[in-house]
């Protein structure tokens, strides 16, 4: 199992990798540019080389990039849609240039339209954004959401429909990223042992766990079914340490990368959360039933 954390570039790709390595992470996630700006510069080739060297030094793999917060490929608003397609193409190009293994994207909001229209809009947007890309090893990961309002991704079936339709329109590899906080907020029981078994059975049946390449490890400030996406420190939210122990030690998940996106309220919070995650993953308690 590879455990890691979201780190920030602070103007330097190398900084993000060095931070992850210094924290003792085995994998990490970054934004390839500002998460709140439509346009971004192409990464500096020198910085890419330094990033690769830092990754090799600390054996950091995989590298996951999270798409910026503005991209909404499910939108049918012509202005937002055009900006989203252009911005996501930039995300793809930067991820390929940097050498990332995965690019995580939220399915987006279909406000004013139907779920089916939103799914179709996302798939078509991904097709347009990825047209003509050079050969690469990048896989795009659809992240589950808290399922609030008109946001896609709160149900496994929606993620599956997006992937299936996208596969008909493009050769771009598509998988999934599951966020523990989002799962709980969307109504999945991942807290109890029977609930976790049921959730994983559903994920296997609908998504195929082999297609779930990354997990985001976040506790939740709100209870199950709240549809509110607010991350908490590991063990301090409504998921709790015991549930994370079951998740991290489950036989079907032990080879998955888990990446923290927990709050930083005080200096040292990143290290503390990562150390807690490592401790829970290394627990000697009996493994749950398959």
From Swiss-Prot:
GO terms for biological process: base-excision repair. GO terms for molecular function: deoxyribonuclease IV (phage-T4-induced) activity; DNA binding; DNA-(apurinic or apyrimidinic site) endonuclease activity; phosphoric diester hydrolase activity; zinc ion binding. Zn(2+) 1 binds at residues 66, 106, 143. Gene3D superfamilies: Divalent-metal-dependent TIM barrel enzymes. Its EC number is 3.1.21.2. Zn(2+) 2 binds at residues 143, 179, 216, 261. It catalyses: Endonucleolytic cleavage to 5'-phosphooligonucleotide end-products. Endonuclease IV plays a role in DNA repair. It cleaves phosphodiester bonds at apurinic or apyrimidinic (AP) sites, generating a 3'-hydroxyl group and a 5'-terminal sugar phosphate. This is Probable endonuclease 4. It comes from Solibacter usitatus (strain Ellin6076). The lineage of its organism: Bacteria, Pseudomonadati, Acidobacteriota, Terriglobia, Bryobacterales. The gene is nfo.
């Amino acid at each position: 199992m590879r455990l890691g954390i979201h780190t920030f570039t602070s103007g330097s790709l190398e900084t993000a990798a060095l931070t992850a390595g210094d924290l003792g992470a085995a994998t990490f996630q970054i934004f390839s540019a500002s998460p709140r700006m439509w346009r971004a510069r192409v990464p500096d080739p020198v910085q890419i080389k330094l990033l690769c060297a830092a990754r090799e030094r600390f054996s950091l793999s995989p590298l996951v990039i999270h798409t910026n917060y503005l991209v909404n490929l499910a939108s049918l608003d012509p202005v937002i849609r055009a900006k989203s397609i252009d911005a996501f193409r930039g995300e793809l190009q930067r991820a390929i240039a940097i050498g990332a293994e995965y690019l995580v994207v939220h399915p987006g909001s279909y406000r004013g339209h139907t779920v089916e229209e939103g799914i179709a809009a996302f798939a078509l947007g991904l097709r347009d954004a990825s047209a003509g890309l050079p050969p690469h090893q990048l896989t795009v990961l659809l992240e589950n959401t808290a399922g609030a309002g008109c946001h896609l991704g709160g149900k496994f079936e929606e993620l599956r429909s997006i992937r299936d339709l996208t596969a008909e329109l493009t050769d771009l590899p598509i998988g999934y990223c599951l966020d523990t906080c989002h799962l709980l907020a969307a109504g999945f029981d991942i807290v109890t042992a029977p609930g976790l078994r049921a959730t994983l059975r559903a994920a296997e049946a609908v998504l195929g766990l082999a297609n779930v390449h990354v997990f985001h490890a976040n506790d939740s400030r709100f209870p199950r079914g709240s549809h509110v996406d607010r991350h908490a420190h590991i063990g301090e939210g409504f998921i709790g340490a015991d549930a994370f122990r079951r998740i991290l030690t489950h036989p079907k998940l032990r080879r998955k990368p888990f990446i923290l996106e927990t709050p930083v309220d005080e200096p040292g919070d990143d290290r503390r959360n990562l150390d807690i995650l490592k401790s829970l993953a290394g627990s000697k308690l009996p493994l749950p039933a398959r």
